[in-house]
Amino acid sequence: MDNGVETPQGQKTQPINLPPDRKRLRKHDGLGKGVKRKLFAEDSSPLKKQIPACSDMETLSSPVKFGCKSRSASALDESFGKCKHETACDCSAIEELLCHESLLDSPMKLSNAHTIFSSDKWKLELEKIIASKQIFLDMSENVELVAYGETLCNLRIFEKISSPFLFDVQSEERSYSVVYVPHNKELCGQFCQPEKTMARVLGVGAYGKVFDLDKVAIKTANEDESVISAFIAGVIRAKSGADLLSHDCVINNLLISNSVCMDHKVSLSRTYDVDLYKFEDWDVRNVMNYYSVFCKLADAVRFLNLKCRINHFDISPMNIFINHKKEIIFDAVLADYSLSEIHPEYNGTCAIAKEYDRNLQLVPISRNKFCDMFNPGFRPLVANAMILVNVCEAFDGENNPLRHCNLDLCAFAQVVLLCVLRMTDKRGCREAQLYYEKRLFALANEACRLNPLRYPFAYRDACCKVLAEHVVLLGLLFYRDVVDIYEKIYDFLDERGEFGLRDLFEATFLNNSKLTRRQPIRGGLASLQSSEYGEKLLHDLRALFLITSSADLDKDTSSLFQM
């Protein structure tokens, strides 16, 4: 999520076939020094969430109000969800996904990497503009990331801005997209030292921690993640047409931080009852409610890509947060931008301006590597297929935001698929997790533990098994389409001479198909097909899963997941 409050994905894992006591992960020999975002900390100890083994993911609560003095806990009345199960429950028997954030070396090293400025002259000029607050706002249609429609004459307006906001900064020859990141000393003193304020630890990761202080989520992060999160928060706020002084946390069903301290690399946001992965109260009779939620989340993906020109690249049920009452979902947001990237055509034009030290910070360069994108358990079919041919294959968006959007929507379809399986299983959500998700997550974790640069063949094998399992699960809902999808992937590998992977894909698919029964979901699936919104849900989901090649990413998906 925006850096506001998710527990860093993958810090909690529960190995397959284990009793309730969770076993610590052993350091896998596939990890190498080239890993950018690591599964293991520097001391080689496994990362873990420091929360009860069976608890729901505890995510942030109420928004922090910046413009007023009423920042007390009484104004923040959202509470964290608790696990419904006792200590002796079988939660730990369910395989949970490891962290799969970016696996490549960081492209943004200020000392020697590509700078966004064509020469020191332009960098010095832009720094001078920022330092003097001579920032001009433009509505030019030629600049996609331009945000606001007026020229600032009153420079003191910057003293009133409390949350990151995007501006178009003009030099004599170039236009830069710069997010102004204000520094609030009062909030810094209140939240930036959570250990000293006895804040409760929600999660621990390789690059920081997530705390809860009076129901406010505090996320500490590393430099790059703080920069990209602050930048994305400013872009979303501005491109939505939000007021310049807005400090909203939720915009267009996207959860963003409403305060980022670039001095301490701390961001604040709000909490929700639970994440979608931990939601267990699915009821096929409420499909209209669920379809409406999915439509809002799909619109969030479209807004992020088509308006903001940003790929999420980490869509999973763990990064979708909801408020609910029993089986009814009232509110849902997409969060966590740790893996997000600007569309590559904007490389070299994006930065943040930090009020606290009046310096510029470059936004990390987008490399668009498929192995950098998504958790393998929710990676689109087309992305996993491309990795099998070339581990370091880059996504060709062709400067077309629709292609970027469809790639994110295909990952969203993987999330919806698991939701439908939980919704339709007559045995209940817990059994659906154990029966349909356990093997998928075990295979995905196998890929997560490998560095694709050091062990490309092992990584491709692991991704091949994940791809086969995706097709197996897809066949449970769309058995008339699964043969065509299977044959397209098989032929794709065969035509490119990847005969070993082709045979591994075939063997894994055939073996896992024998182990997967459709019977538990037949009744629920029939109920889904008999309702108007259930039929629409299955139609839209099927259309996204029929995107199996790079050319398919040009399809018009604007009518899918629309109420």
UniProtKB/Swiss-Prot annotation:
Name of encoding gene: U69
UniProt keyword annotation of ATP-binding present: yes
Name of this chain's protein: Probable ganciclovir kinase
GO molecular function: ATP binding; protein kinase activity
SUPFAM superfamilies named in the record: Protein kinase-like (PK-like)
Keyword Ion transport included in the entry's annotation: no
Originating organism: Human herpesvirus 6B (strain Z29)
Gene Ontology biological process terms, A to Z: viral process
E.C. numbers: 2.7.1.-
Disulphide linkage map: none
Residues the record marks as active site: D314 (proton acceptor)
Family per record: Belongs to the protein kinase superfamily. Tyr protein kinase family. HCMV ganciclovir subfamily.
